[in-house]
């Protein structure tokens, strides 16, 4: 464990300031992310250095299509998530934490990337933003060694820690799940507005940004809602790549797979205002 960044003491309780949940924790409590815990009146990052998944992937798998194409990237994942999406694609490591992990120091991660001849490190699989302290330490060291840092994220973080992190992040794929607060609240236990703010901050930074939306029948496949999503992205930069991904039943959601025709219609709508639109899981 390592002491967490971004928290404050409020009397006998601890308030976490990393993400918009602002968890208020008593001694022994763990945040909604399941990896930030109060012990001895301090907040600790319990997943620091804990790695559940290590792989070398094509950069396109993140997915990033317009950044170092046809390159291989060392990909690291930990455990936990600060959203509770019913359709989680990586629920074994994001929601159900009883899985084996191993310790990997920041130095070891950087050395492994160089050994694998990777041009950088991708922080992915689970939610890397709640791996914040390790992510920040490793990203700083990676930059010192000339490596790139890639973030694959739900974007659920407060502006101050995000801006500090972006100093060392070179590219981001952000999962913009829907364009209604109802979806985020009921399906993910989060807030859309907070994620939209993250998108804006990343777009204003030097990091390359791509966005992914998983299209789910009856939940976020309304074409008018899709137009809102496209308008939002286009208002920032019409060249931001958008990945529209096909849903398959997973975790707690058993809706049928998204019809391919829905994806094709969505692509047509998106291409009216965006330059780079891609389909996934087709």
Go through each PLM region and give its residues:
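N-terminal [4Fe-4S]-dependent radical SAM core
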Residues: 1-16, 20-78, 90-95
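Auxiliary Fe-S-binding modules of radical SAM enzymes
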Residues: 1-27, 217-282
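Flexible, active-site-adjacent loop/turn segments at secondary-structure boundaries
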Residues: 5, 23, 30-33, 46, ...
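Short, conserved glycine- and acidic-residue-centered signature motifs
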Residues: 69, 102, 188-191, 259, ...
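Active-site beta-to-alpha loop of glycosyltransferases that engages the nucleotide-sugar donor
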Residues: 80-83
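The canonical Cys-X-X-Cys-His
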Residues: 85-89
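A short alpha->loop->secondary-structure connector
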Residues: 93-103, 144
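Conserved AdoMet/S-adenosylmethionine-binding subsite of the radical SAM
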Residues: 106-258
């Amino acid at each position: 464990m390592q002491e967490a960044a971004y928290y404050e003491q409020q009397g006998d309780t601890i308030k976490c300031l990393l993400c918009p949940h602002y968890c208020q924790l008593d001694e022994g409590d763990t945040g909604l992310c399941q990896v930030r815990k109060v012990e001895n009146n301090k907040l600790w990052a319990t997943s620091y250095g804990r790695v559940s998944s290590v792989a070398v992937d094509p950069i396109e798998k993140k997915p990033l299509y317009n950044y170092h194409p046809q390159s291989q990237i060392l990909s690291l994942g930990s455990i936990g998530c600060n959203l509770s999406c019913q359709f989680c694609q990586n629920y074994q490591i994001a929601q159900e934490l009883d899985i084996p992990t191993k310790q990997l120091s920041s130095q070891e991660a950087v050395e492994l990337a160089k050994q694998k001849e990777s041009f950088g490190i991708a922080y992915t699989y689970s939610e890397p933003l709640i791996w914040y302290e390790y992510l920040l330490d490793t990203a700083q060291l990676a930059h010192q060694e000339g490596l790139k840092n890639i973030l694959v994220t739900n974007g659920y973080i407060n502006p101050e820690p995000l801006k500090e992190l972006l100093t060392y992040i070179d590219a981001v794929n952000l999962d913009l799940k829907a364009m209604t607060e109802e979806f985020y609240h009921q399906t993910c236990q989060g807030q859309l507005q907070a994620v939209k703010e993250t998108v804006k901050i990343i777009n204003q930074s030097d990091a390359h940004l791509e966005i992914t939306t998983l299209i789910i029948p009856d939940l976020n496949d309304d074409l008018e809602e899709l137009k809102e999503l496209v308008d939002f992205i286009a208002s920032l930069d019409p060249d931001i790549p958008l990945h529209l991904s096909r849903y398959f039943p997973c975790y707690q959601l058993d809706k049928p797979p998204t019809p391919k025709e829905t994806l094709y219609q969505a692509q047509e709508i998106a291409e009216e205002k965006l330059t780079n639109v891609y389909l996934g899981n087709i």
